[in-house]
Amino acid sequence: MFAKETYVARRRQLKESVGSGLLLFLGNDECGMNYEDNTYNYRQDSSFLYFWGLSYAGLAAVIDIDEGREIIFGNELTIDHIVWMGTQPTLHEKAQRVGVTETLPLAELKKYVEKVVAQKRTVHYLPPYRAEHRLKLMDLLGVKPGNEMPSVPFIKGIVNLRNYKTEEEIAEIERACDVTAEMHLEAMRVLRVGMKEHEVAAALEAVAQAHGCNLSFPTIATVCGQTLHNHYHGHTVKEGDMLLVDAGAETAMGYAGDMSSTICAGKKFTSRQKDIYDIQVAAHQAAVNALKPGVYFRDVYDLSCRVICEGLKGLGLMKGNPADAVEQGAHAMFFPCGLGHMMGLDVHDMENLGEVWVGYDGQPKSTQFGRKSLRLARKLEPGFVLTIEPGIYFIPELMDYWKAEHRFTDFINYEKLESYRDFTGLRNEEDYLITATGARRLGKKIPLTTEEVEAMR
């Protein structure tokens, strides 16, 4: 937890941004896996963490801008709770740690909201992403699930604070990135032909645990790298395979790291793997070199895509003008996803608040296949923390689909592409902070080139 002054200042800035009304924060509850008392690992709502700092279940909070009140709602622990959980701080003690002096029982929240509604004042709330939040909004405001109308001023106020990382946040994110790097280095050290994917996943996840961290998202450790988010870990690693690892640590304060690496199963990459890998690295480095304030991230994405197309053209897999191929969307055969995303208290920071505000600054998103998956497109500014993760993927089903529809035949050499059906896919990912003059990698460096990876094997 940061000093209470941090949370006081954040709430003050948010009040000034929104201007009037009641700001409603719904904290997360415990969630049972298969019965009520056997719960998933608890994770507080990130905006609740950002403004209130308390990672406890069963809380809600309001900022009443018009009346100048900040209240945390929750129930004190009973003797039964203490028997099972031990002595805990009181709700009032927890609130004081984040600069809040007023607390009320959770049952009082509905009465407070009803009073505000009766006064014809605005109740601002955020997009619900959990069923429990939808039910609470229905109880508090009579809003049926699916009919929510989240407050745009509230969303924009939060985005305009959380997008810009402070020095104390950057230090916490860097810690997450350092642990994340150690996770990937461990995967490179332990991987052997004959292992199951889940053995590698277990080894790298143990590193996070050993550093007192959780995972920032479910680990990807797969020999089927053509599947972008593959959480299956049951394959046996064979000679000639590449293992794609996408994994990250989350600190006790909730800040995330997110890196990817692609590792040869044996001691060396094959010549064909190295050819594709080198193109990916070139696209990665081009994107990193372009990072600086004032640059639109969509332009960095386009640059990375052009480098990929140029490289694949050199191998005979693509043809024509790379810039035209990217403009028309032919690159998405090999790169059907985005280049990166914002990162902070969420690995995809504030994705629950809407990409249109977080990554696009209110501007519309493209509907083009591949480009529509770009989570970040806006102009870069100092304080932004983001990922760089271009990839090259050979997806047999997509190859067959586009070939049958004769898509982009001016740019894609389908005959040559057939020999790459079994290639799978690869990506590498690093985390960057936009500075006043450029960008700085966060966390310990992990191997990026084929030579660097092979040196770890």
Residue ranges and their predicted role:
Residues 1-457:
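Active-site neighborhoods and metal-handling regions in enzymes and metal-associated proteins
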